[in-house]
Amino acid sequence: MRVFIDKLKDKQDLSFAESKNAFEILMNGKASDDEIFDFLTLLSSKGESSDEIAGGVFVLRDKSKRVNVDDCIDTCGTGGDGMNTLNISTASALLLSSMGIKVAKHGNKAVSSKCGSGDVLEALNIKIDLEPKDIEEQIKKNNFGFMFAPNYHSAMRFVGPTRKKIGKRTIFNMIGPLSSPALVDRQVIGVFDKKLLKIFANALNNLDIKFAWIVNSEDGLDEISPYSKTNVVQLKDGKISEMLIDPIKLNIGANKFENLLGDDAKFNANKMLDIFKGEDNDFSKAVCLNAAAGLIVSEKYTIFIDAYNEARTHILSGKTYNDLKEIQNV
């Protein structure tokens, strides 16, 4: 482990192979607490590279319990934007599943916010502690399955205490959203910092992803924002490109940021139920913007505004609420 730590001390990036080797040592419980501490803090102070992130993802995926499903999408973001918004990507995942898109959602309970995806799904009476075969069945039947990260990544136990001791963001906050136990090859990923857009795209390019959108909005969300421009980096078939989504030009008509602020799991779940029943508000529009990205990445649409309009028509019909009841009954 020391050879990698010494390289990081010299502010040198690790290669993909070196990163894989280092994370193998970490995830096999062969590194001391001091080595884990040095490795994670030095990576953070240097700035994590795409090869370092990809190496970590490769190992974490390899050691996770496996969910065997085909052609699914995930909408798992990094979190950590500090905005305490409603659960936009979780709501967009449920909307997409109601629209016929197979979603293997990977997530956790709250870390920096009041309510993570696991918390809000529990508040909606959706089971989050399912085994792989149950999730496979649920996706087959209802187009939606949730993989609760701690149940699937037992190797994380070796680094958990040191991450707590460090007490701030580490490379694991970036590795987690990319480490789906379902090995999805289509993703919409929100990131907490604009500078991660291309880093994530290059990391995913090492990992056999067919189509991904990595997003960060100019008002600081790790989502597509209904209020301000969102920077998007697209990875499709090995090619990386950039674009901008402007809600003013798209005539989204959202009013004020306060309308997206969340609270505890019960509050957030009730807001989600309201929009699934067809209530039209800023939260509904934000969810449809992010679902539109999912429709693009699933290759059901090629034009963003068309995908958005289809998501709007669907959510306002109330059908999402009826489909949610099927997921709750599992």
From Swiss-Prot:
Matching InterPro entries: Anthranilate_Pribosyl_Tfrase, Glycosyl_Trfase_fam3, Glycosyl_Trfase_fam3_N_dom, Glycosyl_Trfase_fam3_N_dom_sf, Nuc_phospho_transferase
A GO biological-process term: L-tryptophan biosynthetic process
Alphabetical keyword list: Amino-acid biosynthesis, Aromatic amino acid biosynthesis, Glycosyltransferase, Magnesium, Metal-binding, Transferase, Tryptophan biosynthesis
Catalytic activity: N-(5-phospho-beta-D-ribosyl)anthranilate + diphosphate = 5-phospho-alpha-D-ribose 1-diphosphate + anthranilate
Cofactor dependency: Mg(2+)
GO cellular component terms, A-Z: cytosol
Pathway the protein takes part in: Amino-acid biosynthesis; L-tryptophan biosynthesis; L-tryptophan from chorismate: step 2/5
Positions bound to Mg(2+) 2: 222-223
Cofactor note: Binds 2 magnesium ions per monomer.
Gene3D superfamilies in alphabetical order: Nucleoside phosphorylase/phosphoribosyltransferase catalytic domain, Transferase, Pyrimidine Nucleoside Phosphorylase, Chain C
Binding site residues for 5-phospho-alpha-D-ribose 1-diphosphate: 77, 80-81, 85, 87-90, 105-113, 117
Binding site for Mg(2+) 1: 89, 223
Chain positions recorded as anthranilate 2 binding sites: 163
EC code: 2.4.2.18
Molecular function as annotated in GO: anthranilate phosphoribosyltransferase activity; magnesium ion binding
Residue numbers binding anthranilate 1: 77, 108
UniProt cross-references to Pfam families, sorted A to Z: Glycos_trans_3N, Glycos_transf_3
Family designation: Belongs to the anthranilate phosphoribosyltransferase family.
Function: Catalyzes the transfer of the phosphoribosyl group of 5-phosphorylribose-1-pyrophosphate (PRPP) to anthranilate to yield N-(5'-phosphoribosyl)-anthranilate (PRA).
Subunit structure, as described in the record: Homodimer.
Protein name (Swiss-Prot/TrEMBL): Anthranilate phosphoribosyltransferase
Organism: Pelagibacter ubique (strain HTCC1062)
Underlying gene: trpD
